[in-house]
Regions:
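Proteins enriched for Cys/Gly/acidic motifs involved in redox and nucleic-acid/cofactor modification
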Residues: 2-214
């Protein structure tokens, strides 16, 4: 991780009020989540594992690098085994209805795994979560999902996870739009020889091939 970011996180005083402005606000929650994850590891006597599953386009792949970077920073180790992981996040795509059905099917399998691992936290983000119908279905039929957010507030993962840690309630935070771009956060690049460059953020609801309504 960038030494500048690490120095900024270390400078945060958790006894002070939560900063209002980004990225300092997220640095606060990164540091707070580090403490929570460390305490969980000491209690369980093992490292916590996280899986980031990406559906869809290169933009989702780029966003997943950010998600994984945040999770690694707060203490999770990357894993590819969803059933044994302590944190699983689906970065969803909704270009075709079949993509949604795949996600629902995978969630059904995770429900069984969560029964066996009470530490497991399940999160959903990405384009599918910009559909009001999909979010409502998660709320009513998949209540075991812990955190739900969309395409505009990927950078808030640490804050949303902290809220889940401290409230034990389902956290839903969907934005319709934003002018805020927060880039100064940990990232875990999948490849050392290539990287994505964002040309837009969020969802503008006007891709003709997508099922998200205008």
């Amino acid at each position: 991780m960038d030494n500048t970011i690490e120095n900024m996180i270390n400078s945060i005083d958790l006894s002070a009020p939560v900063p209002e402005y980004e990225p300092m606000r997220q640095y606060y929650y990164l540091k707070a989540c580090r403490q929570i994850v460390k305490a969980k590891e000491e209690r369980l006597k093992r490292p916590l594992k996280a899986v980031v599953s990406t559906f869809g386009c290169q933009m989702n792949a780029r966003d997943s690098e950010k998600l994984l970077g945040i999770l690694k920073d707060i203490g999770y180790e990357e894993s590819d085994n969803e059933e044994s992981a302590d944190f699983v996040i689906y970065n969803t795509c909704t270009v075709r209805e079949n993509a949604n059905l795949r996600v629902y099917g995978r969630l059904g399998q995770l429900k069984k795994a969560k029964r066996n691992n009470h530490e497991m936290i399940i999160a959903m983000c990405g384009c599918m979560m910009q559909e009001p119908e999909a979010v409502e279905k998660i709320k009513t039929s998949y209540r075991f999902v812990d955190v739900v957010f969309g395409t505009f507030n990927i950078f808030k993962l640490a804050e949303l996870l902290y809220n889940r840690f401290t409230s034990n309630e389902q956290i839903i935070d969907i934005w319709d739009s934003t002018k805020e771009v927060v880039e100064e956060l940990p990232t875990s690049r999948k490849y050392p020889f290539k990287s994505g460059v964002n040309i837009m953020f969020g969802c503008n609801n006007f891709c003709t091939y997508c099922i998200v309504p205008y």
